[in-house]
Amino acid sequence: MSDNSDTNVSMQDHDQQFADPVVVPQSTDTKDENTSDKDTVDSGNVTTTESTERAESTSNIPPLDGEEKEAKSEPQQPEDNAETAATEQVSSSNGPATDDAQATLNTDSSEANEIVKKEEGSDERKRPREEDTKNSDGDTKDEGDNKDEDDDEDDDDDDDDEDDDDEAPTKRRRQERNRFLDIEAEVSDDEDEDEDEEDSELVREGFITHGDDEDDEASAPGARRDDRLHRQLDQDLNKTSEEDAQRLAKELRERYGRSSSKQYRAAAQDGYVPQRFLLPSVDTATIWGVRCRPGKEKELIRKLLKKKFNLDRAMGKKKLKILSIFQRDNYTGRIYIEAPKQSVIEKFCNGVPDIYISQKLLIPVQELPLLLKPNKSDDVALEEGSYVRIKRGIYKGDLAMVDQISENNLEVMLKIVPRLDYGKFDEIDPTTQQRKSRRPTFAHRAPPQLFNPTMALRLDQANLYKRDDRHFTYKNEDYIDGYLYKSFRIQHVETKNIQPTVEELARFGSKEGAVDLTSVSQSIKKAQAAKVTFQPGDRIEVLNGEQRGSKGIVTRTTKDIATIKLNGFTTPLEFPISTLRKIFEPGDHVTVINGEHQGDAGLVLMVEQGQVTFMSTQTSREVTITANNLSKSIDTTATSSEYALHDIVELSAKNVACIIQAGHDIFKVIDETGKVSTITKGSILSKINTARARVSSVDANGNEIKIGDTIVEKVGSRREGQVLYIQTQQIFVVSKKIVENAGVFVVNPSNVEAVASKDNMLSNKMDLSKMNPEIISKMGPPSSKTFQQPIQSRGGREVALGKTVRIRSAGYKGQLGIVKDVNGDKATVELHSKNKHITIDKHKLTYYNREGGEGITYDELVNRRGRVPQARMGPSYVSAPRNMATGGIAAGAAATSSGLSGGMTPGWSSFDGGKTPAVNAHGGSGGGGVSSWGGASTWGGQGNGGASAWGGAGGGASAWGGQGTGATSTWGGASAWGNKSSWGGASTWASGGESNGAMSTWGGTGDRSAYGGASTWGGNNNNKSTRDGGASAWGNQDDGNRSAWNNQGNKSNYGGNSTWGGH
């Protein structure tokens, strides 16, 4: 593309100097004079007259090749001629020009254009080409081609030089890049080559014209002015852009630089510091943590600081390199010292008390930012007149006022309300008769009262010294205007969250006791804000801010912010809790939630300046307290967390009482005499646990009464109730039918009778008469069902109660006692030896009968339903051998079956075949050769043939007291079953004749069979077996020489061996 592209560039188009040139195809149509002239004027705001004449001439006369060559070959006109020709063109522009004049003008304009082209070569690239100008230039394209080649080469060289000079200072504006991402596109040289090829292609096709044809477009003076104006405009724009950039940078620094520093300083004050500033550098000295006594941190910091100043003054220029000393409230028992070496710290801390220099720790670098992070200190700066509380001594918890502060801030002088007893409780030495003062203690301290010099003079004059009318010294302590002035260490004083009550503040008021409520409210405002709690629904009033005096209702609360719906506002607003105050009205029921009267309740009487006065339901006195310490409540009854209604409390070593009205600190009680009184919480020694108390009494009928039994009065109003407690000869009873004194009354046990006693309920279930041997001995032989003891029901009672036990665990192992109480797995045992009660696991006890006997464990006791084994008397302790026979055994041996041994036993559980009848004892045998189911004696007695076993002595003696001689009846003489004999002679079950052992009716005949001769149980013996018990008929038939039960002998079962499997 030619450098000489377009000279018709207006001032307005100069702003588009960076835009790409517009390519317009060459127009083949010939335009008339008027159209060409109009288009030329519209194409730019600044157009030279030479360009206008050239456009008119070229639009009317087609270009000729020969004429163009001649015009180029002519010498250039001087500058004056060019200006004259331009003037002539202006004068002749109104009329039509002739052909010769037109040719002359064309030649002159082309020469003038050549002069201006060299100066405008660098600016032609930057100027966009207008559409109409390109159309007008198309007619002159052929004329430029007719110039000489030498002129073209010279012009091109000059233009290239000028282009190089102009392109050097020109710089493109750098595109703003992202500082974090590399998003710059790479541009290759191939794209430039492609653009050059496209331009050459467009030139060949005629869409882009060369600048050679534009020599006639502008004259030298107009082009020079344009160039000067354009350059001046460029300079102005560059200067303006630089000024704008500097001004913008200055504004940014002023606007944001100042605010950022403010924000940084504010953030630093709030405790925020960028972490990069907290990190230690290479030159940072090490920090060591040194152990010290807890609570002495601040005091040690002050001591070490003083020591550092003293050492620096003493050592002069050679100072100890201690850079800093500090402590953190979060890390108790440790101070931190910054020094370059460990030896410096050891030398510096040597000799300082309460510092354990051997226990020091180097702080790691990673923990230094957290250690050095600034935090708001929670320490309260003490000032004269501020309130504090004392931490120790007899004044522990008392409110005090700061009077003076020492210079080193280690001690404070406090104004305290004294607690003095003036020697009332001092002891007197009996030998020397001198007063021995007792040191006051916190448990026995006197109530707070102002110092009374009259009382001190009367009771303890020796320790009183008067300095003036207002100042006294008593026991080496100063009292001014009745107040004690005493010095305390700063660590013995509590300075945080002090919330004094109105009563405490009244003691520090004037002599008349008046208190300025406004000053009180201001003094405790911060302390109250720390504990004040607002709940949704509380009515409040705004104290500070734009909405001061507005009232509303709390809708939501957070830690420090409360959302309030104010009256007259639709949108809820948020306020700090410290700017709010609760609202109460006379008649509201309130409860104290903070302070000394916490838990008290009452009815609001008066509200004045944030102070609420209400009538306490406990003390029936007026109490004044700040509004934010109250809460509106529906239940006006305040109770204590330690004592409740109907609790039995101990007032002294001998007096007890029952609480009939429980409050926070005041209680109404009824004592054992029935007197109702009001006491304080401090008057109660302890609470009696009635669930574990083992006290009892006896009613008018002699029945035992215990706690929990229901009783009724025998005389009077016959009040009925449940026993709460038994004290000596009085019973505390509570009734649901009585309203007075919460249903509690006191009655003597001799005037009541038990209605539902536990012992009565147990006695009704057990029939002890059935266990009396004397009553049982008068009864007939009991049956098996009659003998079985009834199963006793536990009825909810512990089976171990009242049992005699032996301890199996260490400590009291082997000792006997009786179980008095059982609570879960623990049993209270009263020892027989020491008359002492101990508590022990009930599974570690062995349970016995009261008379002795075999012991069992607790599990066995439960399985036996509380029954313990009976004690054995006399021969019953002898056990039977294991080879015991069911029938008779060898002579001289003692045998038993089912625990039946020989001897005399009066009990039913040991059936030993003596005089006592034994039921269902199939196998008891006597000594000698007595047989039991085939011999003469069947129940252990001795007989000779027909002797019965139901009596023992004599051969014919009756077992039930009768005497017989063989044939007599064993049930008292004469036969009771039809004839004379039933168990010894002929049975009357089949024959009615008189028999003395003739024949048996049990299946066969025998000589003397019934229970003595040949047995008829399954066999038939006609050989008249010996009457001494020959052959047995149990499944075998014998001549009498053998027993039917594998027993061999020549003797009868009356006197021989037993027939039950033994020899």
From Swiss-Prot:
Q: Tell me the GO molecular function terms.
A: DNA binding; histone binding; mRNA binding; protein-containing complex binding; RNA polymerase I core binding; RNA polymerase I general transcription initiation factor binding; RNA polymerase II complex binding; rRNA binding
Residue ranges for the region (15 X 6 AA tandem repeats of S-[TA]-W-G-G-[AQ]) are 931-1063
* Signal peptide per UniProt: none
In terms of Pfam families, this protein maps to: CTD, KOW1_SPT5, KOW2_Spt5, KOW4_SPT5, KOW5_SPT5, KOWx_SPT5, Spt5-NGN, Spt5_N
Q: Where is the composition biased (Low complexity)?
A: 966-993
Q: Does the keyword Nucleus apply?
A: yes
Give the KOW domain ranges.
Answer: 382-415, 533-560, 584-615, 799-832
Region (Disordered) residue ranges read 1-228, 942-1063
- In this chain, where does the modification Phosphothreonine occur? T35, T133
Example GO CC term: the record gives: rDNA heterochromatin
SMART domains referenced in this protein's UniProt entry, alphabetically: CTD, KOW, NGN
Q: Which GO terms describe its biological process?
A: chromatin remodeling; intracellular mRNA localization; negative regulation of transcription elongation by RNA polymerase I; positive regulation of autophagy; positive regulation of transcription elongation by RNA polymerase I; positive regulation of transcription elongation by RNA polymerase II; regulation of DNA-templated transcription; regulation of rRNA processing
**PANTHER family xref list:** SUPPRESSOR OF TY 5, TRANSCRIPTION ELONGATION FACTOR SPT5
The entry's free-text remark on domains says: The C-terminal repeats are critical for activity.
Q: What miscellaneous comment appears in this entry?
A: It is phosphorylated in a PKA-dependent manner in vitro.
Name the chain's protein: Transcription elongation factor SPT5
Q: Which organism is it from?
A: Saccharomyces cerevisiae (strain ATCC 204508 / S288c) (Baker's yeast)
Q: What is the lineage of its organism?
A: Eukaryota, Fungi, Dikarya, Ascomycota, Saccharomycotina
